[in-house]
């Protein structure tokens, strides 16, 4: 299908969304859940709001367009952006996911770019020129995006630094397709004056037709700004600016001492006055300065986009349902002498937390914007070794952003005893803090302490998916499902079949056929979870905290107990094989696990009741918790020093074990009278109902994220009866030819930086009524006067069956002709009958036709099934016939052998007495009896 055909098809499908006033929620409709985070900005037509989509925990942007206060042209632009984006799929183009209609507000769901735009990037350079490699990296991505949209037959018409967005990994995303235009071929032209003045090509300024080469001019302007940090053309007013563009008077020259001549030639080629002499996007990519880097850059783009890439949850032909739930999100900490949960006011609103982790002496939090915050715990008193990553050893009591990771999207973080490790969206691993045991993974090449995040080069070609830290060792799971470990090797906690310390990542050999999906480190042991829910463990098994001990009881042998002190290689925890484990959390002396049914299992030491079984006795095996947790589905669990905290699906939080130093958030008044400081039964804590999204316990401390639902709203794509079907028709017709029919005007928007950054659209020709005196003297608003001036008068016949010959010839009558018509000729206006019923009848006929086709299709499917069965039956008969043929062939061969034997027998035997001829004939008849011939049958009836 051609690009134009796809454009029309998408336009019609989107129009059906807007045109239908009511549509039932069928079983095929998908329900998507969103949580608003913060407002990103305000535009001319509405707000841009950041949302978190709970299905995949991703961030998306909802672009709101208030349709009620827009002109028809502006509505068409909004619809046009959806149509264009739905056609384009490229790593350097803003991805479109969905659109919804809430009353009179159009909501467009787009990809979120957390690195701002190229305009802000240039401003923040502060006269510090970009490196040429950086410019080439940006240029390659921009031109790749332009090449994609041009191949789809789309003219962007508003390429500028404000519409070029970036991620924190410097991945370019070309956006804002509201002014984009679909052309029927590469030779088609457009003529409407649209775009931003600073980036307008000379042909647009001169009011002549333009093509895809106009976008190349804008690319040249963007490249010029990257090289000079200034506008290509600058002026105090629009007229002077257009003159400079047409004359080609650049603001400043290019410095060939900083940039190569090849790169400067690209600028000159793109800013060629003659459009025919400008290169295409593909020709720019083929230039030597980019071509020899192209493969590496394409691989880099693909790798950086891997974390952002997600399948579209719906197409424009579907009608998904959006469930928007407003939630309050808060972070609480307690322990270390603090018995009351303390709320951290830093993590709220747009800076809410998505992951938390506790270390022995510090906390770490990753926000929804994927920024890392660290600070010391409330206990304090411990010497710091740089595990906060702030470049010093200061004890920051409040959460502080790790500035050295600015520009990096931190996905996950894990804390050790005195070090911290985090991974980014690209799978890069950073470490900082103490390197005494080699936990930083750089072979102790950076010193005993690293105060700032340090990139571990080992994983540059092996992106990391998960990381977990013990007290003094680390395990990492890569995206290729390989497991690596390093650090202290005591008790074999690294799973490397030895107890040696390792200062750089070493691959852990996993049994063939096992797919590891999760790694988790305890204080001196490690766990690996497989795809089937099995558990592999290594390290110290004191108190059976790894679940490796074997305990059996029977009639003959009343008790059989096999203890495993420790293991240096990965060993299957057989006692856990009866369950399909979904998550596991090791503490210092015990471990808790959750199976696929949400049941909680505990094993290890029970000295302080941390197993939650209602007593303080020693338990040798695995304990399936009941009591207060009986029948509840546990969703989160974490183990600290001699205590356990768990959260359930019904929004309750439980804690049990050693309550000393505030570990259980239990004040003396809450403790039952006469009881000790420990509790062996899970007890609810934390007051009212809260949904826990993440939980971490370490030492005496607990940190968690809790959410409360404030309100919820369901948005259906077709919840409004607002119809803008004419907009879809105009979009579709606009893309079918080489000439645009746009005649709307858009006023020039102001530029906060003293310029003309905004987008304008103006028709070069003026209407015929600009000099009409009575129109000028009237109190009619200017916009309405303009609409009347450009309107056309369509005469309507008196009856639906009557068609004026003049109307059929002229089609429409201009307003000038109406003025010249005598008044008496206009006294009796005629009206055409409403054709809505006719259209409805046509729709019903089409629906009947579709139903007929569907019925015929079902019949064909049944017939195909029947024929398939017959073919299968015939194949079976054919196989039987072939087998019979083989049997017959074998019998024939046997008969042939018998014939040969008989022939030899008669030749070797002497002739019998009597008539020799008669004897020979009788012998022949006897021999043929083996064949069942007629001679044999006839002779058998003759008496001997």
From Swiss-Prot:
Q: Which GO terms describe its molecular function?
A: ATP binding; metal ion binding; protein kinase activator activity; protein kinase binding; protein serine kinase activity; protein serine/threonine kinase activity
After translation, the protein is modified as follows: Autophosphorylated on serine and threonine residues.
Query: GO annotations under biological process?
Result: cell division; mitotic cell cycle
Looking up Pfam families in the UniProt record yields: Pkinase (PF00069), WD40_RLD (PF25390)
Q: Which residues form a coiled coil?
A: 835-890
As recorded in UniProt, its EC number(s) are: 2.7.11.1
Q: According to its UniProt record, which residues of this chain constitute the active site?
A: 158
Binding positions for ATP? 40-48, 63
- Bias class Polar residues marks the residues at 768-781, 801-816
Comp. bias intervals (Basic and acidic residues): 738-748
Catalytic reaction annotation = L-seryl-[protein] + ATP = O-phospho-L-seryl-[protein] + ADP + H(+); L-threonyl-[protein] + ATP = O-phospho-L-threonyl-[protein] + ADP + H(+)
Location of the protein in the cell: Cytoplasm
Function field: Pleiotropic regulator of mitotic progression, participating in the control of spindle dynamics and chromosome separation. Important for G1/S transition and S phase progression. Phosphorylates nek6 and nek7 and stimulates their activity.
UniProt subunit comment: Homodimer.
Name of protein = Serine/threonine-protein kinase Nek9
Top-down, what is the taxonomic lineage of the species of origin?
Eukaryota, Metazoa, Chordata, Craniata, Vertebrata
Q: Which gene encodes it?
A: nek9
